[in-house]
């Protein structure tokens, strides 16, 4: 195409971060054909756990390969405004879905005999998804309280993500949400 590679992107001009010794050091070749420099040391540019993300021993936390380190609960990827809009949207949609599914179920209760087999699974589907929307609404109301550990200024621990079943409310919320989502999906197939 006639384009020249830009000088700024020439790889030979860039410093290699994994370089273990200066480029001027003598290089020797071992029996396997790999090069080795004298006094070769490895620099570690990896992740280290900040003090406010450290957890006590025995909790089983592991974040980015570091033991006793928990992921932070505050947003890392989105602005606060974007999170507020997303949370508000989930809350509003969950209320709308809860109203729609409860309306369907209450319509069924008016005349139960009217809904025979082809229509009956829709009622079960509606009940399942009314509970799913209720779980989303409860999660919206609780905010980060179920998914995040509280910060402790005395221990210098920041707000971190809950691991596994350490928070019973988070576990119950997830289990009910998962069960009724799967049940609703199965009723949709039937």
Curated annotation (Swiss-Prot):
Keywords recorded for this protein, A-Z: Cell membrane, Cytoplasmic vesicle, Developmental protein, G-protein coupled receptor, Glycoprotein, Membrane, Neurogenesis, Receptor, Transducer, Transmembrane, Transmembrane helix, Wnt signaling pathway
What is the membrane topology noted in the UniProt record heading this document? Multi-pass membrane protein
**GO BP terms:** nervous system development; Wnt signaling pathway
Query: Is Cytoplasm given among the entry's keywords?
Result: no
State the Gene Ontology terms under molecular function: G protein-coupled receptor activity
Which of the residues are on side Extracellular?
1-89, 143-169
**What InterPro entries does its record include?**
Frizzled/SFRP, Frizzled/Smoothened_7TM, GPCR_2-like_7TM
Localization: Membrane; Cell membrane; Cell surface; Apical cell membrane
> What are the transmembrane regions?
90-110, 122-142, 170-190
Q: According to the record, which residues are glycosylated?
A: 144
Q: Entry's Pfam families?
A: Frizzled
Parts forming coiled coils: none
Q: Specify the FZ domain's residue ranges.
A: 1-20
Q: Name one GO cellular component term.
A: apical plasma membrane
Q: Which residues lie on this side of the membrane: Cytoplasmic?
A: 111-121
| PANTHER family for this protein | FRIZZLED, FRIZZLED-6
The free-text domain remark for this protein reads:
The FZ domain is involved in binding with Wnt ligands.
Q: Which family does it belong to?
A: Belongs to the G-protein coupled receptor Fz/Smo family.
Q: What does this protein do?
A: Receptor for Wnt proteins. Most of frizzled receptors are coupled to the beta-catenin canonical signaling pathway, which leads to the activation of disheveled proteins, inhibition of GSK-3 kinase, nuclear accumulation of beta-catenin and activation of Wnt target genes. A second signaling pathway involving PKC and calcium fluxes has been seen for some family members, but it is not yet clear if it represents a distinct pathway or if it can be integrated in the canonical pathway, as PKC seems to be required for Wnt-mediated inactivation of GSK-3 kinase.
Protein name, UniProt field: Frizzled-6
Q: Which organism is it from?
A: Gallus gallus
Q: Taxonomic lineage per UniProt?
A: Eukaryota, Metazoa, Chordata, Craniata, Vertebrata
């Amino acid at each position: 195409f006639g384009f020249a590679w830009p000088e700024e992107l020439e790889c030979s001009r860039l410093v290699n971060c994994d370089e273990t010794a200066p480029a001027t050091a003598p290089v020797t070749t071992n029996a396997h054909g790999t090069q080795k420099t004298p006094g070769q040391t490895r620099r570690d540019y990896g992740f280290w756990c900040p003090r406010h993300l450290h957890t006590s021993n025995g909790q089983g936390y592991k974040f980015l390969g570091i033991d006793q380190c928990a992921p932070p609960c505050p947003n890392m990827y989105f602005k606060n405004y974007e999170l507020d809009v997303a949370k508000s949207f989930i809350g509003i949609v969950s209320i709308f879905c809860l109203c729609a599914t409860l309306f369907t179920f209450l319509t069924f209760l008016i005349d139960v005999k009217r809904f025979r087999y082809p229509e009956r699974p829709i009622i079960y589907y509606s009940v399942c998804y009314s509970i799913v929307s209720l779980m989303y609404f409860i999660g919206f109301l609780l905010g980060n309280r179920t998914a995040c550990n509280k910060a402790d200024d005395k221990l210098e621990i920041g707000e971190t993500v809950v691991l596994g079943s350490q928070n019973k409310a988070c576990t119950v919320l997830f289990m009910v949400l998962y069960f009724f989502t799967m049940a609703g999906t199965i009723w949709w197939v039937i």
